[in-house]
């Protein structure tokens, strides 16, 4: 579980956003007063960060990957100004700090050895045994035997808290349902007139911020299996259940995770754990319980890396871990659900 604990994913929007073509319409909703922000004090609200290519970024991107101190340490990154982020920009004086966490250097199962070890010969940009070293964003460059972050400089080399050289793959399941009144009717927002969508949110133990459940893809594991496993562990506390309870949870989740779904995003993640040589990538997938019956038969219970779990109304007032709010906005748009009281903002999207 250590690898999963260290690898909880955050994400922003890049050119590799993958959106399904389906737009789900809703009707028959009842209006209620506008909901208040359920998370007034946690997280931060990010703008969309769009990668402009494998060797350069726009001015408003690649921000979290340059923040100091590095998570879980007192290590300060070398400062990288916006105009020097891209690798195509010559910077002879660039002198990044070297840092790899002790927990990674200890050689757990989820971590690679050091590049300098003679017995370690990773096959970058391809499937390396059970380890996926291909990037969702295409080929990445190798410099002096080390992968180079496709989004640009971060001010730090090594792996930090990340186990793999190059891409570290994660998955984020976004489970949604319509908000309903006591009679079972869908509820609309009084200003936008659109039905209110809800999603399952967890409160992370490591930073106390609310987020989408999710975690690292285990070696050899399919993304679909990771999505279901992580939701069960964090939102249903499946790790602490009896064998019979686990089977029951598995059967109910199978019904939800087997239906049609929307791939909201996949690709590079602007994450504070990223370095010049190791970075996060994720696939965020929306599973929607249209009638609400499947999730009504499952009791939410925080587990694993989650301190709390609950259903949350979706709107632009949400402040979530990293840029999870961007994923949630995309879900609201694809489901034609309420997002903002500002109609113009709704129509412009990202």
UniProtKB/Swiss-Prot annotation:
Cofactor(s) the protein requires to work: Mg(2+); Mn(2+)
Chain intervals for the UniProt region annotation (Disordered): 53-77, 116-153
Family the UniProt entry places it in: Belongs to the Nudix hydrolase family. NudF subfamily.
Alphabetical list of SUPFAM superfamilies matching this protein: Nudix
Localization of this protein: Mitochondrion
Record bears the keyword Transit peptide: yes
Uppermost EC category: hydrolase
PTM sites of type Phosphoserine: 121
Biological processes per GO annotation: ADP catabolic process
EC id: 3.6.1.13
Positions of transmembrane segments: none
A Pfam family per the record: NUDIX
Reactions listed under catalytic activity: ADP-D-ribose + H2O = D-ribose 5-phosphate + AMP + 2 H(+)
GO cellular component term, pick one: mitochondrion
Domain Nudix hydrolase stretches: 178-334
Record bears the keyword Mitochondrion: yes
Name the record gives this protein: ADP-ribose pyrophosphatase, mitochondrial
Its job: Hydrolyzes ADP-ribose (ADPR) to AMP and ribose 5'-phosphate.
Motif (Nudix box): 215-237
PANTHER family: ADP-RIBOSE PYROPHOSPHATASE, MITOCHONDRIAL (PTHR13030:SF8), NUDIX HYDROLASE (PTHR13030)
Keywords: Hydrolase, Magnesium, Manganese, Mitochondrion, Phosphoprotein, Transit peptide
Gene3D superfamilies: Nucleoside Triphosphate Pyrophosphohydrolase
First and last residues of the transit peptide: 1-46
GO MF annotation list: ADP-ribose diphosphatase activity
Subunit structure and binding partners: Monomer. Interacts with GLOD4.
């Amino acid at each position: 579980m250590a690898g999963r604990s260290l690898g909880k994913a955050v994400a922003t929007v890049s050119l590799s956003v993958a959106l399904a073509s389906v737009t789900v319409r809703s009707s028959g909703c009842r209006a209620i007063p506008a909901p208040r922000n359920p998370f007034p004090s946690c997280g931060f609200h990010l703008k969309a960060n769009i990668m402009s290519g494998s060797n350069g970024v726009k001015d408003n991107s690649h921000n979290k990957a340059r923040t100091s101190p590095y998570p879980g340490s007192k290590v300060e990154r070398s400062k990288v100004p916006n105009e020097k982020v891209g690798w195509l920009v010559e910077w002879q004086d660039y002198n990044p700090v070297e840092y790899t966490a002790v927990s990674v250097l200890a050689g757990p199962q989820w971590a690679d050895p050091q590049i300098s070890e003679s017995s370690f010969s990773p096959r970058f940009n391809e499937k390396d045994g059970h380890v996926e070293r291909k990037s969702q964003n295409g080929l990445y460059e190798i410099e002096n035997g080390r992968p180079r972050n496709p989004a640009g400089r971060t001010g730090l080399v090594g792996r930090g808290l990340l186990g793999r050289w190059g891409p570290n793959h994660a998955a984020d399941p976004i489970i949604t349902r319509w908000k309903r009144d006591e009679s079972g009717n869908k509820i609309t927002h009084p200003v936008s007139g659109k039905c209110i969508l809800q999603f399952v949110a967890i409160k992370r133990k490591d930073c106390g911020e609310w987020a989408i459940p999710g975690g690292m893809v285990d070696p050899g594991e399919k993304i679909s299996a990771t999505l279901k496993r992580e939701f069960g562990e964090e939102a249903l506390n499946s790790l602490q259940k009896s064998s019979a309870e686990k089977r029951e949870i598995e059967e109910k989740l199978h019904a939800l995770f087997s239906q049609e779904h929307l791939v909201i995003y996949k690709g590079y993640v602007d994450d504070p754990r990223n370095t010049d040589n190791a970075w996060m990538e994720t696939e965020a997938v929306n599973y929607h319980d249209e009638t609400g019956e499947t999730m009504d038969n499952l009791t939410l219970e925080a587990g694993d890396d989650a301190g709390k779990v609950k259903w949350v109304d979706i709107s632009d007032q949400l402040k979530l871990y990293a840029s999870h709010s961007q994923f949630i906005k995309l879900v609201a748009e694809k489901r034609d659900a309420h997002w903002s009281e500002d109609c113009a903002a709704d129509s412009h999207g990202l």
